């Protein structure tokens, strides 16, 4: 079954991770809840860090034919092996931005949240795969380079190893290479 397939790979991933290593698992609504229980069993509930909601598209076309709520997001579960090692990323404040009280902003910018958008309207935090984009491969579980760059940036440094057990078209390896990470891709 699918859970056995996942269990075998997740146990190997846990054993390969360094103490400050992390794991990100992309799932849709069909399997996310089963996989969360499995990950809690393998990594320990205390090592669950965050559920990231990735809005995957716009509500249009065939999606509107759904008989109930229209699905418009996938989930990425974020776990650590033992110690959290995380590089926080910020979206810079727009030029000329001032706070409500009239003072200039403090800090590096807007901290990226755990809901990642794919909307052209929300330029601030948009990670999208456009329908006719060259980056679109046709894989149902495709992640674009911006999404993978965000994950790899937050979890690794130059020279670290990135592993993808479901490498598909190889986008994870391409992004890891551009970011000067080592990578292992399995399909």
In which residue ranges do the predicted regions lie?
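Conserved acidic carboxylate
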Residues: 187
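Class I S-adenosyl-L-methionine
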Residues: 1-161, 165, 184
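Class I SAM-dependent methyltransferase "Motif I" SAM/SAH-binding loop
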Residues: 166-170
């Amino acid at each position: 079954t699918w859970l056995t397939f996942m269990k075998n790979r997740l146990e190997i991933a846990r054993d390969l991770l360094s103490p400050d290593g992390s794991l990100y698992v992309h799932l849709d609504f069909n399997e996310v809840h089963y996989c969360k229980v499995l990950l809690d069993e393998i990594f320990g509930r205390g090592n669950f860090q965050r559920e990231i909601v990735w809005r995957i598209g716009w509500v249009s076309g065939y999606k509107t034919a759904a008989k109930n709520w229209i699905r418009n997001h996938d989930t990425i579960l974020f776990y650590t092996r033992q110690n959290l090692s995380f590089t926080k990323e910020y979206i810079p404040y727009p030029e000329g931005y001032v706070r409500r009280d009239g003072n200039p902003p403090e800090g590096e910018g807007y901290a990226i949240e755990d809901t990642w958008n794919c909307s052209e309207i929300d330029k601030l935090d948009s990670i999208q795969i456009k329908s006719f984009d060259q980056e679109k491969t046709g894989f149902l579980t495709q992640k674009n380079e911006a999404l993978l760059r965000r994950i790899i940036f937050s979890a690794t440094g130059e020279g670290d190893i990135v592993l993808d057990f479901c490498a598909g078209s190889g986008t994870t390896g391409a992004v890891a290479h551009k970011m000067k990470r080592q990578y292992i891709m399995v399909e």
